[in-house]
Amino acid sequence: MGERAKALLVDDRKDNLLALEAILQGLPVTAVAVESGEAALKQLLTDDFAVILLDAHMPNMDGFETASHIKRRERTRHVPILFLTAADRDAQLALRGYAVGAVDYLTKPFDPWVLRAKVSIFVELWGKSQQLKAQAEATRERDAQWERLTETVDEAARVLRAGGEDAATEALALLEKARWGS
């Protein structure tokens, strides 16, 4: 369960990616930086992320198109997307970001401490989600064990009800086998 959370940083400008990596330094998250929407989609095929920081304006596939692809995929639709963009007075762009599934839309320059706080929250939520998944798996395994034990007890009871000279020995063997999980 000790898997470290990852943040996907998507921006066509290397200097912006370096700035984002510096802002996230010290947080319990591994930053994975890519320079295009296409590269982001490719990265999402192999890695799971706690959060995506996505530049809205990029050549070829912009952030809005990238986000819509991310939200259409079953494997990635739950990953929170924070749009980051250059100072923009057009409120319609923020609305467009929310329409394609963003959880937030920040314009540059933004307060790095605010971004750190937002990323920290999503990393914490991701960690809780991982814990819940592990607990759900443990519960499924326990339920399966109980199901097998119940079936064995039922079988032993059938053997005893059927009677016969070896019924008790056979029922006991079934129960012992179940007890040791074989």
Regions found by a protein language model. Give the residues of each.
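Active-site beta3 strand of CheY-like receiver
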Residues: 47-54
